[in-house]
């Protein structure tokens, strides 16, 4: 692991662990069909078996938007050229942060599983997201994100 890589756990004062030495970011891509791209997380991953956004650890000096777009490209084949950032939402715990980047995709595309972190990738209609077993932190954030779409 290079010194610039953020791939490491951060432990909070209460013992809770968070992925990303420099924080983390995820991309919530929104299709022209009003669907969001979700990732079914591999069983071995943190909160495995749940659905959430492609995302991961930020690198040192990397912006949250750049990290979210990079992670989505790595994990789901999301083409950055099709994205227009709509807004960001930040959970800042003081010692660790997670930024959700919400971006419109100018056209529908087929996501591609390109690493072992995903069991499946799926465009999910916004009104059906709650039907899935969601990553607990995404489940907490989803109502506010949905209302802003």
Feature map (PLM): residue ranges:
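Conserved Nudix-box catalytic region and its N-terminal flanking loop in Nudix hydrolases
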Residues: 31-74
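Structural detector for helix-capping/boundary residues
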Residues: 56, 70, 124-127, 132
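Acidic, metal-coordinating catalytic segment for phosphate/diphosphate chemistry
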Residues: 1-26
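Active-site-adjacent beta-strand/loop module that shapes the phosphate/pyrophosphate-binding cleft
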Residues: 31, 89-115, 122-128, 143-145, ...
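A short coil-to-beta-strand element that immediately follows conserved catalytic motifs
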Residues: 79-89
């Amino acid at each position: 692991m290079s010194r610039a890589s953020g791939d490491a756990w951060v432990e909070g004062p209460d013992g809770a662990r968070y992925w990303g030495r420099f924080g983390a970011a995820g991309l919530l891509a929104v299709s022209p069909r009003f669907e969001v791209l979700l990732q079914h997380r591999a069983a071995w991953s943190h909160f495995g078996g749940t659905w959430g956004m492609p995302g991961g650890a930020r690198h040192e000096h990397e912006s949250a938007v750049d990290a979210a777009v990079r992670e989505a490209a790595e994990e789901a084949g999301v083409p950055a050229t099709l994205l227009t950032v709509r807004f960001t939402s930040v959970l800042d715990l003081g010692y660790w942060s997670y930024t959700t980047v919400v971006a419109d995709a100018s056209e529908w595309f087929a996501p591609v599983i390109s690493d072992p972190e995903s069991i499946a990738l799926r465009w999910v209609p916004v009104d059906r997201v709650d039907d899935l077993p969601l990553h607990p932190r995404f489940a907490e954030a989803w109502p506010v994100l949905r209302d802003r779409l």
